[in-house]
């Protein structure tokens, strides 16, 4: 467990990147407050996010979450002009495991007509190989009637990775290779600092791997950066970005979320308004397969 002391809140939040330091995950906080007792702060209130105003048809808004959700919350996101949701399907806790809460969240998001992408927060210190962790995610979703077409791999919080960049690259290669065996599109969630620290600025990654990068100045509305890609700079093998996380620790529809903007690609089946493919009864009873992923264009 990384211990931080004698630092300001802003530095602490920036050092943690978009994750809490102890669990190496995208920030997805308790409904109202963030406990940060390890660094001497009691609670951080999630501020209400500004209303989405999108005047650029080439961009769309999303949120990323790793907490349980309800149908009403997903419907609220849809009516609040969010087009997609990134849902964690693999948790790093323990040795790493399929995140069972993702099943209900995916069904709820599908019912609401939201586009759905799945990300995994791998556990690089586990005895499980990278491909085994991807298998757990893939089989967990498939066994619950959910077909996955793409996966995003979280590569952040250097303190939670091996010290050897070569070891980390091999671990990631194991995940990526397995994902491609399944025919999945692969994306990486990281930024220039994290990528450099964890992989040694790995520059030979396949060019078909997508990038979701984060850039915030801190938590809440005052820490937001513009919901554009104007601040992107190429690094590693990434010459362009498909998704940007521009806000963290904000409240939307009674959920504490991070907010994202992405380049609009070919709409996925999961984001179609033509929901008569699946009735709510079908979704609840698992009679039909839900297809997720592919919302983000190359």
From Swiss-Prot:
Residues 1-16 form the signal peptide. Expressed in intestine, IL2 and IL6 neurons and some neurons in the head ganglia. It is found in: Cytoplasmic vesicle lumen. The keyword Signal applies. Residues 59-277 form the Ch-type lysozyme domain. It comes from the Eukaryota. InterPro entries: GH25_Enzymes, Glyco_hydro_25, Glycoside_hydrolase_SF. One of its GO terms (biological process) is cell wall macromolecule catabolic process. Involved in resistance to Gram-negative bacterium S.marcescens and to bacterium Gram-positive S.aureus infection. Belongs to the glycosyl hydrolase 25 family. This is Lysozyme-like protein 1. It comes from Caenorhabditis elegans.
């Amino acid at each position: 467990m990384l211990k931080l002391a004698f630092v300001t809140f802003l530095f602490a939040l920036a050092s943690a990147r978009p994750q809490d330091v102890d669990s190496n995950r995208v920030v997805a906080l308790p409904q109202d407050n963030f406990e940060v007792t390890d660094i001497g702060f009691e609670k951080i209130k999630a501020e209400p996010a500004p209303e989405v105003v999108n005047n650029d048809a080439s961009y769309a808004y999303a949120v990323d979450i790793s907490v349980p959700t309800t149908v009403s919350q997903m419907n609220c996101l849809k009516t609040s002009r969010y087009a997609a949701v990134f849902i964690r399907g693999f948790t790093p806790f323990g040795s790493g495991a399929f995140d069972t809460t993702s099943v209900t969240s995916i069904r709820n998001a599908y019912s609401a007509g939201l586009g759905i992408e799945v990300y995994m927060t791998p556990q690089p210190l586990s005895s499980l190989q990278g491909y085994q962790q991807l298998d757990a995610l893939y089989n967990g979703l498939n066994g619950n009637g959910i077909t996955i077409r793409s996966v995003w791999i979280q590569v952040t919080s250097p303190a939670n990775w091996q010290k050897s960049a070569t070891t980390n690259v091999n671990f990631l290669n194991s995940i990526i290779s397995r994902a491609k065996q399944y025919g999945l599109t692969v994306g990486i969630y990281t930024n220039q600092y994290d990528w450099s620290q964890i992989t040694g600025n790995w520059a030979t990654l396949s060019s078909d791997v997508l990038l979701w990068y984060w850039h915030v100045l801190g938590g809440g509305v005052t820490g937001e950066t513009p919901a554009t890609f104007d601040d992107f700079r190429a690094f590693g093998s990434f010459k362009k970005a498909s998704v940007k996380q521009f806000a963290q620790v904000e409240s939307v529809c009674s959920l504490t979320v991070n907010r994202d903007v992405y380049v609009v690609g070919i709409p996925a089946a999961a984001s179609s308004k033509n929901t008569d493919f699946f009735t709510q009864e079908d979704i609840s009873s698992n009679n039909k397969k839900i297809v997720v992923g592919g919302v983000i264009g190359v």
